[in-house]
Amino acid sequence: DLANFLNCLGARVRGAGTDVIKIEGVDSLGGCLRYAVIPDRIEAGTFMVAAAATRGDVVLENVIPRHLEPLIAKLREAGVEVGEEEDRVRVRASGPLSPIDIKTMPYPGFPTDMQSQMMALLSTVPGTSVIVENIFENRFKVADELKRMGARIKVEGRLAVVEGVERLQGACVRATDLRAGAALVVAGLMAEGETRIDNVQYIDRGYFNLEQKLRMLGARIWRAPYDEKTPAQDNAVRKSALI
């Protein structure tokens, strides 16, 4: 998409989406008055996983299904119904789900930015699921927070083994990064009781009005101010929480 935008401005960029990108310099850029940025596949994917986790029925519009193919394939493998149209997808999950294995890979493989949300989903799927993180190190910090909610997850290096439990329990948890925060929101939607997620400034980096969009789908979620008398953990800057 960046290459398309630059070419719209008069740049000469070839090979976008391949292993080799060739750029020929030009004197100046300009002339592209309007450009529509492609939809965020990770935001769309997060809503898809949330729909599956809550056994919901959700239609997402203004998406590019082919950008979501790795996630769609894994959701279907787990037993989730995913219908595709030109610019929308429908996610339905009414029956029992099955455990799956996931390996993160560079695009067009399964995105590392979706494995935390899938870990939350798989935490209540009966059986054993395995997640292998091939992109980044220390990408499983959310596992400790999910375990506060009753999840059974064992992490060894780049490998996480998820043993599905019947139900998660609401708890006070902390977002350690952007995608971990999104995963905890998914977990909170599934859990019995109230879940409080601190450090939501991480979530705000990648999701605009997340709680409002979820409320439109029927979720009971709101943003609450911190009690200033409570000391911040690890000197983190904490301004609000999602409940």
Swiss-Prot record:
Q: Which reaction does it catalyse?
A: phosphoenolpyruvate + UDP-N-acetyl-alpha-D-glucosamine = UDP-N-acetyl-3-O-(1-carboxyvinyl)-alpha-D-glucosamine + phosphate
Q: Give me the residues that bind UDP-N-acetyl-alpha-D-glucosamine, please.
A: D113, I135
InterPro entries, alphabetized:
Enolpyruvate_Tfrase_dom, Enolpyruvate_Tfrase_sf, MurA_subfamily, RNA3'P_cycl/enolpyr_Trfase_a/b
Q: One Pfam family this chain carries?
A: EPSP_synthase
**Keyword entries, A-Z:** Cell cycle, Cell division, Cell shape, Cell wall biogenesis/degradation, Cytoplasm, Peptidoglycan synthesis, Transferase
Asked if Protein biosynthesis is a keyword of the record, the answer is no
EC top class, as a word: transferase
User: Is Cell division tagged as a keyword?
Assistant: yes
What pathway is it annotated to? Cell wall biogenesis; peptidoglycan biosynthesis
Q: Which GO terms describe its molecular function?
A: UDP-N-acetylglucosamine 1-carboxyvinyltransferase activity
| Primary location class | cytoplasm
GO BP of this protein: cell division; cell wall organization; peptidoglycan biosynthetic process; regulation of cell shape
Q: Which family does it belong to?
A: Belongs to the EPSP synthase family. MurA subfamily.
Q: Write the protein's name.
A: UDP-N-acetylglucosamine 1-carboxyvinyltransferase
Source organism per entry reads Desulfofundulus thermocisternus
